[in-house]
Amino acid sequence: MKTTLFLTLALFAIALASHGQQPPLAGGFSQAAITDAEVLKAAQFAVKAHDAKLTLQYVTAAEQQVVAGINFKLKLTTSDARKADVIVWRKLDGSFELTSWQSIAADPAILTTEYIYDTGPYPQIHATTIVETPTGLVTAWFGGTAEKNPDVCIWVSRQLPDGQWSEGVETANGVQPDGSRHPTWNPVLFQPKDAPLMLFYKVGPSPSTWWGELKTSADGGKTWSAAQKLPQGIFGPIKNKPVQLANGDILCPTSNETDTKPSAWAIYFERTADLGKTWTRTELLHDGFKIGAIQPSILFLGGDKLQAVGRTKQTKVFQITSEDAGKTWGEISLTDLPNPNSGTDAVTLADGRHLLIYNHTAKGRSPLNLAISKDGKTWEASLVFEDEPKKEFSYPAIIQTKDGLVHITYTWKRAKVKHVVVDPAKLTTKPLMN
């Protein structure tokens, strides 16, 4: 009896020492680090045991209890955007058993979450874009060993009739006629009315030295034209989608980054009335220092009034308005919405509401949030797609398709492209918390 008691106490002491046990909580549980290797093993086991098709996104809370091994009580989020409270028993032999799984329903506005691919032929991806074509959805991103490396190419995937996504296809690269090679950047897909699909992207060593190129597809992204270099001083949409105005003009939101120190970041707009054959552009709309702004998105405020919002160096989302369909623009200003110097995107819905997808933080690229506005001035919080400390969920793209649903893609930890479908009719709001 004494021997049994001694062994039990010894095991208890070893477990406490090895797992950094904190003061006991109710039920004999103690707090555990969500980054602890055994906690993560238990969480991954729980997800696969519950549904082999799911993957663990992150653990948000962890407790542990030493009872003939260790019980881990975990709060976690899975790849279908659902949360769960689980208990996993790690036995004395080191194996795991899932003893409890309690799903917490995802927000009813989130209809689908998925990855465009499981694994790709590149270590990193970034800068997604998505568009609806007459034959279905098409998405693109850049991928390679790392951003800025010469092997970074533009990849395209199409949603097939069965809802699955085609394998990503290398569609553009930075190989030059003399054999040299530059990285590609920031693809932007756009479907003009009654015209071929357009793929804009940048080629060059850096944002201050790159140039714009354009490819088109007459079959919904299956095949593509040769690359066309845009005219000197024209870059196409720098990150976010263009809009087609009532007169048929395509208005591209763009920006410039100088190679000075500090770099001046300034926005402007380009316009084509003939599908990219000829172009005009505004001048830079501000000095790029007091407010350093890039990567605008365009919203429709009614009539010829437009608004652009986007990324800054000043930890706030910028805004600027036009009263004449983008020919001239007012003064740029900062909103109350935080921005960690990371890309955003926005769209005006068919019902007139505006959606902004962005990182609601002044630092880091998590969480990833959706905000709603009726007038482009007052914003309310709606959804949180991702919220994992010290991870990256960034550079989103957002569109509304003809069926009224909202489609979103974004960089998931620089490893995958994530696609989320939202029903805007089911969105609820609450005050923003800064």
Residue ranges and their predicted role:
Residues 1-5:
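Positively charged n-region of N-terminal signal peptides that target proteins for export
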Residues 19-108:
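N- and C-terminal low-complexity/disordered segments
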Residues 7, 30, 51, 59, ...:
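Compositionally biased, intrinsically disordered low-complexity regions enriched in proline and serine
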Residues 107-434:
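Asp-box/BNR beta-propeller blade signature and adjacent active/binding-site loops
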Residues 7-15:
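Bacterial N-terminal signal peptides
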